[in-house]
From Swiss-Prot:
This is Aspartyl/glutamyl-tRNA(Asn/Gln) amidotransferase subunit B. Belongs to the GatB/GatE family. GatB subfamily. GO terms for molecular function: asparaginyl-tRNA synthase (glutamine-hydrolyzing) activity; ATP binding; glutaminyl-tRNA synthase (glutamine-hydrolyzing) activity. The keyword Endoplasmic reticulum does not apply. GO terms for biological process: glutaminyl-tRNAGln biosynthesis via transamidation; translation. Gene3D superfamilies: 1.10.10.410, GatB domain, N-terminal subdomain (1.10.150.380). Keywords: ATP-binding, Ligase, Nucleotide-binding, Protein biosynthesis.
């Protein structure tokens, strides 16, 4: 029997508002434990939540970017559960009237495009962070308590772990472009739970799903789903039953492990939040937020191809990261050739980032500096080979490319008379290579070019070297 895989994802995104969703506490990552905490966050008696308008605007902006319908009437609800990182014993969330519904995004896998539906996008508050120490104690940091979150729930439209990976990449990219979140998984500002079930091919009814947690990277999402796909298939083929349960992905064993039997929404005893009035979002408010949405990745991709004339490959690579795309825009605005900027970003810059595990905004090089360096290549001041030395300095320490070239004596030798003298000195020292070249051995010319570059420490103008060398060889 063959099975069809059904996957849906629930993605939590922390919004980078200045303050928390219901209190004036600072919303900042990386502070000392329990320093960004307020009595409202902890649910002290007598405290009342006040809704952060910026969080609502950010949620609407994200929902609009994901093609959602924006609610006119919405409200907040209490989700009741007890856990040490939840001091109020309830979470303020949205149950039956989310801020956004019926959205979609388009993904591409193996050259095939596909729309993935988004069921809903709702606002809620985050819980604290629980850390289990090796000393047998558990420690809780309430800095994250009350951080504004949006939860984005997809339709069960994905049919493979590869599609789930592509969906996450596209979703992250869109949210990043809106500017409402940093969407950094390593900092917890993007978290993902996955639901997966199998059904016999041709059957319309869904199978029993399992929920996967502890998915700390996009690759773990894919690996966890791949394992769970095989586990469920094996269980079904042996006549077993799939239970509705929550499982976690173990990075060491590369397996999913049972955590608990899955709760249903009834277990949370949702009811309307009594301390917050319902929210009315009129058309004027919606249009004001819509006007603030910047150019999104698909629109930028189309512009790069149709207006700038970039290849589809280059445009896809550049727009896959807002940081990379913004860097490209700023560098070309400084007058650098766009193809050269694209080549450097996809080549040397990306290679450095991958080698050192750094983001683009962590590098010392600026768009202005890269543009100046490219212009130095274009006007013949430095060669492409010398440029790599300049780049190495810029990416580590920053600075002005012109000054680096002057201080390190890296200016390209382009004086014909000076180069002619060096070429003849090299020829005088390598008479056998001249004979070999005259006898049709073209490798001899390559050897001579190498000797000239060595004599000039790589600073000779390559096209000019080739021209003068050809002339002098003919004269011998």
């Amino acid at each position: 029997m063959n099975f069809e895989t059904i996957i849906g994802l629930e993605v939590h995104v922390e919004l980078k508002t200045n303050s928390k969703i219901f209190s004036p506490s600072t919303n900042e990552f990386g502070s000392d434990p329990n320093t960004n905490v307020n009595p409202i966050d902890l649910g002290y008696p007598g405290t009342l939540p006040v809704l952060n308008e910026e969080a609502v605007n950010f949620a609407m902006k994200a929902a609009m970017a994901l093609n959602c319908e924006i609610a006119t009437d919405t409200k907040f609800d209490r989700k009741n559960y007890f856990y040490p990182d939840n001091p109020k014993a309830y979470q303020i969330s949205q149950f039956d009237q989310p801020i956004g519904e019926n959205g979609w995004i388009e993904i591409e896998v193996n050259g095939e495009k596909k729309k993935i539906g988004i069921t809903r996008l709702h606002l809620e508050e985050d819980a604290g962070k629980l850390t289990h120490g090796e000393d047998g104690y558990s420690y809780v940091d309430f800095n994250r308590q009350g951080t504004p979150l949006i939860e984005i729930v997809s339709e069960p439209d994905m049919r493979s772990p590869e599609e789930a990976y592509a969906y996450l990449e596209k979703l992250k990219n869109i949210i990043q472009y809106t500017g409402v979140s940093d969407v950094k998984m390593q900092e917890g500002s993007l978290r993902c739970d996955a639901n997966i079930s199998l059904r016999p091919i041709g059957q319309e009814e869904f199978g029993t799903k399992a929920e996967l947690k502890n998915l700390n990277s996009f690759s773990y999402v894919q690996k966890g789903l791949e394992f769970e796909e095989k586990r469920q298939e094996k269980e079904l083929l042996s006549g077993g039953e799939i239970l509705q349960e929550t499982r976690r992905y173990d990075e060491k064993t590369k397996e999913t492990i049972l955590m608990r039997v899955k709760e249903g929404s009834d277990d949370y005893r949702y009811f309307p939040e009594p301390d917050l009035v319902p929210l009315y979002i009129d058309e004027e408010w919606k249009e004001r937020v819509r006007s603030e949405i910047p150019e999104l990745p698909d629109a930028r991709l189309e512009r790069y191809i149709n207006e700038l004339g970039l290849s589809e490959y280059d445009a896809n690579v550049l727009t896959a990261s807002k940081q990379m795309s913004d860097f490209f825009e700023e560098a070309t605005a400084e007058g650098a050739d766009m193809k050269q900027v694209s080549n450097w970003l996809m080549g040397e810059v990306s290679a450095y980032m991958n080698k050192h595990y750094k983001e683009l905004d962590e590098l010392a090089i600026t768009p202005e500096a890269l543009a100046k360096m490219i212009n130095l290549i274009e006007d013949g001041t430095i060669s492409s080979k010398i440029a790599k030395k300049v780049f190495a300095e810029l990416v580590e320490n920053g600075g002005d490319p012109q000054k680096i070239v002057e201080e390190k004596g890296l200016v390209q030798i382009s004086d014909p008379a000076q180069l002619k003298q060096i070429v003849n000195e090299v020829l005088d020292q390598n008479e056998q290579s001249i004979i070999d070249f005259k006898n049709g051995k073209n490798k001899a010319k390559g050897f001579l070019v190498g000797q000239i570059m060595k004599a000039t420490k790589g600073q000779a103008n390559p096209p000019l070297v080739n021209k003068i060398l050809a002339e002098e060889l003919n004269n011998r």
